[in-house]
Design a protein with these regions (language model features):
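Phosphate/nucleotide-binding beta-alpha loop and adjacent structural elements of enzyme active sites
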Residues: 1-256
Length: 256
């Protein structure tokens, strides 16, 4: 669902991105765009790791983007940084994601040599990132998980060891886990001396509800919000928390 703030709110945007991973097509149709009568949407990134954004996106060199969930596809983040020269804060405690971030830096430092990139890489990944020239001085990696409080939690792995994603939600994946530090968006902002978030992107495998609810409770309202609602998509939401959060965004917090 893509909606637009009114003139009073300086035409800030909210983009709630409902889409499927694992090779399925992203859930965003022309009918939805026409239904909400909004700006044209464009997809930024690879077929797998890309996200839909409004064509008239307002970001610049002063903008701050928080990207929760990195995995092994940074195409969206790299494209945003290259295009808008904005600051990107990448947040993901997954070991494979940390390695991928290091690999991508090596890729650009070594004349874009694709052989330095390890892991399960999408077939269109190199074609997407090769023409770009991101500024890694404006990219910060935060090696913790996003949650509703500052603590340590089990970070469950998938049963297929080739898959990169892990989750803080029990029963979503397998029983094997790492133990990771987690923190709130507010605390991470304070640690990085940020007073605002211009765009928040979340693909955090079921933790999105607690994270966003706490963010709103802390009076933090990003101009653009992109969320993959994994708790709902993976049928792990018997209490309808996803629906409640979307209703809060639309009706209480006045995202439109």
């Amino acid at each position: 669902v893509y909606k637009l703030h009114d003139e009073i709110n300086k035409k800030d945007y909210t983009l709630m991105n409902l889409h499927f991973q694992g090779g399925a097509k992203r859930f965003m149709t022309n009918e939805l765009v026409q239904f909400f009568n909004q700006d044209k949407l464009i997809k930024i990134g690879t077929d797998y790791g890309g996200w839909w954004i409004p064509e008239s996106l307002h970001l610049d060199e002063t903008s701050v983007v928080y990207s929760g969930g990195v995995g092994q596809d940074m195409s969206f983040d790299i494209l945003l940084q290259h295009k808008y020269n904005c600051q990107i804060v990448l947040i993901d405690p997954t070991k494979k994601a940390i390695q991928h971030f290091n690999d991508i830096q090596s890729y650009y430092k070594n004349n874009k040599n694709p052989y330095v990139i390890t892991g399960n890489i999408q077939k269109d990944y190199i074609d997407v990132i090769q023409p770009l020239d991101p500024n890694f001085n404006k990219m910060t990696y935060v090696n913790i998980g996003l949650w509703k409080e500052c603590t340590t939690l089990k970070f469950f792995k998938q049963t297929n060891e080739n898959h990169v994603s892990q989750t803080l939600v029990e029963t979503m994946f397998g029983n094997s886990y790492d133990v990771v530090n987690v923190n709130t968006i507010k605390n991470i902002m304070q640690e990085n001396n940020h007073t605002k978030i211009d765009m928040l992107k979340l693909d955090i495998e079921g933790a999105e509800i607690e994270v966003v609810e706490r963010m709103f409770d802390d009076n933090i309202y990003p101009s653009y919000v992109l969320i993959e609602f994994d708790l709902y998509l993976k049928k792990k939401d018997p209490m309808n928390k996803t629906k409640a959060l979307i209703e809060r965004m639309l009706f209480k917090e006045q995202y439109k």
